């Protein structure tokens, strides 16, 4: 392996690393994945599930762009559930329980069977840099591997430290050593390196649980798979999850031992995830609550391990034993592995571009938890984008950037690059200002053409997508053009639904806009629907919410005006009158690409945006008077001229 050359080197084999490798290799680039443990490829370090609110949206987006996660999630699903099914379409989300061992195996096989991709077990100790250009990596044995682009996807492993009570151990998760050297080198190069914290709950033995004291939680019978390539018939047997709750006794034990928690005695300095708090955090922040729910989730079909969702903890083992036994159903529980916390390094993400290349070192890309995110889906989305852009940088293609109005992936990356993060970033539907047009059901309509243009979606797969879109259009046209007359028989059927009688002839589209009607009611009126729910549901939503969608699209058009106003690379913020020192510092730090991005920077007020616009207009007038010299590409002059 010594002195071997590749196009793209990917460091790490988690969810970000997998998508980065596959996208690069599928675009024809000679790609190498380096991981410390090939047995842990695609390993689910925490919860054995994929998707959720907003997260499920991103899994579908990854899939339509040619990524891998959706297929793997469908293939290894052991329970399917649609969250918020009774709420509006913008906030519904798909979540699947997975067999974590089969998931890892499926992803590993995908990597080993992918042309243009090699997998190497080894540890990357440092980068090979030629001034500000990354040209490869050095392994622990001293061998050098050269690459035209390098992607770091190290997850929680950079200077990772595990905490159980007051005991500490080096590692990014149980059974795996930390990555030492990379973050120190980046810090020496000038990167702002910070610490974050995450945690995981205990794993319990199935036979030690009294299931009669818990509440079964079944999955959904109707399945909308993540991938357009998957069947709606799940391949694996479906299992139950179970619900139970903590008690006041549970909380008393935890409160009485907070002095033994590394989070509460000052040992852990990193900030933990706000939206996935430990049980210590829950009973402290929500002291008025007498109980918290927890779900018992099987980790697979051939394992006895149960994941205790919602009870992440880093308390000592004896304390965990005591408080677990106060939870109904767990009175005699046996713990296979205790919960623990992990503290790790991350790079402040305002130091990267939207293409996920670092601003300081060329041809070095970052993806996943190294950028301050939390979650498999967030990591996979970044891995896909980093892999595409690393490949494009070598192939001479333009950077691939998704807008906030195009995808949740675009919202996430823009948030990270523009605002940074001080805590593990998790995706929510509330983060997207255009969420009504970023639904799960219309992902194909939003992104399939882009996926084909990128080259990650095969001709055969694109034909499936095209067929699906055409069938949706046919159905929508039939709804628009088929008229229903208010005959006696029709009025009688409407009364049974019930819905008000028709006072005049209506198209089926007009009728479907009634809030009490669903597409299934149309069949009572002899309207033939497509048998595929993936055809019917998106059309029904478009019809019912057409007015809201139109208003959202109008807002997008308005916001795009600011997004299309490019800011020059050499813009001297220090010279702009009307900007506060804080605003100047933040603008210089982020270096926004557009005026739209500038207005999203925390601490930059609307008055600052006006000041920038006035400055640029004034600069343009000076130039038109011939009072300024010529400048190079990317300068204020060239952009204003553009």
From Swiss-Prot:
Top-level taxon of the source organism: Bacteria
Disulfide topology: none
Main subcellular localisation: cytoplasm
Entry's Gene Ontology BP terms: tRNA methylation; tRNA wobble uridine modification
Alphabetically ordered keywords of this record: Cytoplasm, FAD, Flavoprotein, NAD, tRNA processing
SMART domains with a match to the protein in the record: GIDA_assoc_3
Amino-acid positions noted as binding FAD in the UniProt annotation, renumbered to this chain: 12-17, 124, 179, 369
Entry GO MF terms: flavin adenine dinucleotide binding
UniProt cross-references to InterPro entries, sorted A to Z: FAD/NAD-bd_sf, GIDA_C_N, MnmG, MnmG-rel, MnmG-rel_CS, MnmG_C, MnmG_C_subdom, MnmG_C_subdom_sf
Keyword Coiled coil attributed: no
Residues that bind NAD(+): 272-286
Cofactor: FAD
Compartment(s) where it occurs, according to its Swiss-Prot or TrEMBL record: Cytoplasm
Recorded GO CC terms: cytosol
Subunit structure: Homodimer. Heterotetramer of two MnmE and two MnmG subunits.
HAMAP family the record matches: MnmG_GidA
NCBIfam families reported in the protein's UniProt record: mnmG_gidA (TIGR00136)
Functional description taken from the UniProt entry: NAD-binding protein involved in the addition of a carboxymethylaminomethyl (cmnm) group at the wobble position (U34) of certain tRNAs, forming tRNA-cmnm(5)s(2)U34.
Family according to the record: Belongs to the MnmG family.
Protein name as catalogued: tRNA uridine 5-carboxymethylaminomethyl modification enzyme MnmG
Gene: mnmG
